[in-house]
Design a protein with these regions (language model features):
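Alpha-helix boundary recognition
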Residues: 42-43, 71
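Basic- and aromatic-enriched surface patches that contact anionic nucleotides/nucleic acids
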Residues: 2-37, 50-164
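A short, surface-exposed helix-loop junction/capping segment
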Residues: 43-51
Length: 164
């Protein structure tokens, strides 16, 4: 059994210094992007998925349920990006959401086994009414953008913490 370290004023001070030092390593901003702009920047390569990200693993049903959540206007978790020296943004968390949105809007993904919007089973983006397509593309997503000075180790650590 490990001996517990006694909490002393010196340890409290050292802990505070460590906390402040590590907090300074992560600077970020939040931005809201419309779905249309997110997809445009992703298609152009302005937003990209790094090598350390796991491969696209959502099953068709998970992708459909995510699209259904967007159509229903449900809150969608933040995506996390990080700035790069070349001006692009690396997708730290949100790659599967981004790929699913692109697959639905650009590549004719068909919805299936929806939980609530059962009348949309078998629909692709193009099958939706013009008004619904416009609303879908104008839906905003909140993105946390880490400063470009954020190291690869910190980015990977954040990815691992979010996805555990």
């Amino acid at each position: 059994m490990m001996a517990k370290k006694k909490v002393t004023p010196e340890r409290i001070e050292a802990a505070e210094r460590q906390l402040k030092d590590l907090q300074r390593q992560v600077e970020y901003d939040t931005k809201d992007y419309t779905l249309e702009l997110l997809l445009d920047k992703f298609e152009k390569g302005d937003f990209y998925i790094p090598d350390y990200q796991r491969q696209f693993v959502w099953k068709a049903n998970n992708r459909s349920l995510f699209i259904e959540s967007v159509l229903l206007g449900l809150p969608i978790p933040f995506m996390f990006f990080a700035g790069c020296e070349d001006g692009r943004l690396e997708i730290i968390d949100g790659a599967q959401r981004m790929q699913t949105l692109r697959e639905f809007v650009k590549y004719k993904m068909k919805l299936n086994k929806l939980a609530k919007l059962t009348e949309l089973d078998g629909f692709s983006f193009d099958d939706l009414s013009t008004a619904t397509r416009r609303k879908f593309l104008n839906r905003t997503f909140r993105v946390v953008v880490l400063d470009e000075k954020t190291t690869t180790d910190i980015r990977q650590d954040l990815f691992n913490r979010i996805n555990t």
